[in-house]
């Protein structure tokens, strides 16, 4: 690694300080880089972080390293109780982003006169890291959503007839969430936009409280407005590439399919999950011809993406679906019209396990 032109600093204390903060910044960048590499599989972030490390390395002159005095450094071995609270990978990443930003700021201040090239590089990297940290946070959220999606078994889709004013919608969904459903898809074709927004906000809050995914049907604007985990689209809705551009790469994108070619197209276009159905006749879409179990069997062999069988599913016909290869189901009436939505949800979940 070729060093930048440099005249040694006369003040030993400043040289030691710069050496320590170069070490701190480079080490912290490596921690973030490795998470982007192994945890997020984001090559473009890895390359950016690697470039920043190497740029700092070119400023890490021998005279700084020779000023190092580990034996007399009063900060050696010091720790903070907060370090024991980093239970998730993102906690480690966030702590190291902050560590790097602080180290770079110190370098800017103390290297401005004796090593202006280092100060300029530190400033540029610090501002770049502010933006990259947000990108990593979003990527981490997307990774978590997709992992959670893999573990989903039962998705509740709401009905347009539910009335928020009587608390039926919230009460029913909350009961199902308490029972352990993994995912809620908000669907309301009849309400005004203002009522949809109010309902979606309430449901999104409920889902966050219970650790469940919250998806909005059709309406990307509504999904973004309430910070939903994703959006579900039908065959006549926006093309996948347009939808992805609007919602970003870190939110989930689902697509309804009625036959194998649609499934293959949705998978090739980058959808995160699929709806397979309607398996049976439904009151929600009475005009839609049911596909029966044949397509369910095809889907079970055709894709590794998570997919949900949908359409007139209840406890009485669930076993036949399981035998056909369905591991996940989406239901509407079975729970929304139940006198005991919690008990029905538990019954369906137990049958899926």
From Swiss-Prot:
Its job: Condenses 4-methyl-5-(beta-hydroxyethyl)thiazole monophosphate (THZ-P) and 2-methyl-4-amino-5-hydroxymethyl pyrimidine pyrophosphate (HMP-PP) to form thiamine monophosphate (TMP).
Family annotation (SUPFAM superfamilies): Thiamin phosphate synthase (SSF51391)
PANTHER family named among the record's database cross-references: THIAMINE-PHOSPHATE PYROPHOSPHORYLASE, THIAMINE-PHOSPHATE SYNTHASE
Protein known as: Thiamine-phosphate synthase
Residues the entry annotates as binding 4-amino-2-methyl-5-(diphosphooxymethyl)pyrimidine: 185-189, 217, 256, 285
Metal-binding keyword on record: yes
Annotated segments matching region Thiamine-phosphate synthase: 129-353
GO CC list: cytoplasm
Catalytic function, reaction form: 2-[(2R,5Z)-2-carboxy-4-methylthiazol-5(2H)-ylidene]ethyl phosphate + 4-amino-2-methyl-5-(diphosphooxymethyl)pyrimidine + 2 H(+) = thiamine phosphate + CO2 + diphosphate; 2-(2-carboxy-4-methylthiazol-5-yl)ethyl phosphate + 4-amino-2-methyl-5-(diphosphooxymethyl)pyrimidine + 2 H(+) = thiamine phosphate + CO2 + diphosphate; 4-methyl-5-(2-phosphooxyethyl)-thiazole + 4-amino-2-methyl-5-(diphosphooxymethyl)pyrimidine + H(+) = thiamine phosphate + diphosphate
Gene3D superfamilies according to UniProt: Aldolase class I (3.20.20.70)
Organism (species): Prochlorococcus marinus (strain MIT 9313)
NCBIfam families recorded: PRK02615.1, thiE
Binding positions for 2-[(2R,5Z)-2-carboxy-4-methylthiazol-5(2H)-ylidene]ethyl phosphate per the UniProt entry: 282-284, 312
Binding sites annotated in the UniProt record for Mg(2+): 218, 237
Cofactor: Mg(2+)
Unknown: annotated span: 1-128
EC number annotated for this UniProt entry: 2.5.1.3
InterPro entries: Aldolase_TIM, ThiamineP_synth_sf, ThiamineP_synth_TenI, ThiD2, TMP_synthase, TMP_synthase_cyanobac_bac
């Amino acid at each position: 690694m070729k060093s930048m032109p440099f005249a040694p600093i006369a003040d030993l204390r400043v040289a030691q300080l710069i050496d320590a903060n170069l070490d701190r910044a480079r080490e912290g960048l490596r921690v973030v880089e490795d998470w982007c590499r192994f945890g997020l599989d984001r090559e473009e972030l890895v390359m950016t972080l690697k470039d920043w490390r190497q740029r700092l390395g070119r400023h890490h002159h021998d005279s700084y390293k020779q000023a190092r005095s580990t034996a007399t450094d009063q900060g050696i071995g010091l720790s903070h109780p907060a370090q024991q609270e980093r239970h998730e990978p993102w906690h480690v990443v966030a702590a190291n982003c902050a560590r790097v930003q602080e180290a770079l700021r110190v370098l800017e201040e103390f290297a401005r006169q004796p090593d202006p090239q280092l100060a300029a590089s530190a400033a540029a990297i610090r501002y770049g890291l502010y933006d990259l940290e947000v990108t990593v946070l979003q990527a981490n959220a997307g990774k978590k959503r997709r992992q959670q999606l893999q573990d989903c078994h039962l998705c509740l889709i709401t009905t347009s007839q539910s009335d928020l004013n009587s608390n039926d919608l919230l009460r029913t969904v909350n009961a199902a969430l308490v029972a352990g459903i993994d995912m809620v898809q908000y669907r309301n074709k009849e309400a005004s936009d203002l009522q949809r927004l109010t309902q979606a906000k309430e449901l999104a809050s409920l889902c966050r409280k219970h650790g469940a995914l919250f998806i909005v049907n059709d309406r990307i604007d509504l999904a973004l407005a309430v910070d939903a985990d994703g959006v579900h689209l039908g065959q006549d809705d926006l093309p996948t590439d347009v939808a992805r551009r609007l919602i970003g790469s870190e939110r989930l994108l689902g697509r309804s399919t009625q036959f194998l070619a649609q499934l293959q197209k949705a998978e090739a276009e980058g959808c995160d999950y699929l709806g397979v159905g309607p398996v049976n006749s439904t009151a929600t879409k009475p005009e839609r011809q049911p596909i029966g179990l044949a397509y369910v069997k095809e889907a079970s062999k055709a894709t590794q993406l998570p997919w949900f069988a949908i359409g007139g599913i209840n406890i009485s016909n669930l076993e036949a679906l399981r035998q056909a290869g369905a591991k996940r189901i989406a239901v509407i009436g079975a729970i929304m019209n139940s006198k005991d939505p919690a008990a029905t949800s538990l019954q369906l979940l137990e049958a899926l396990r």
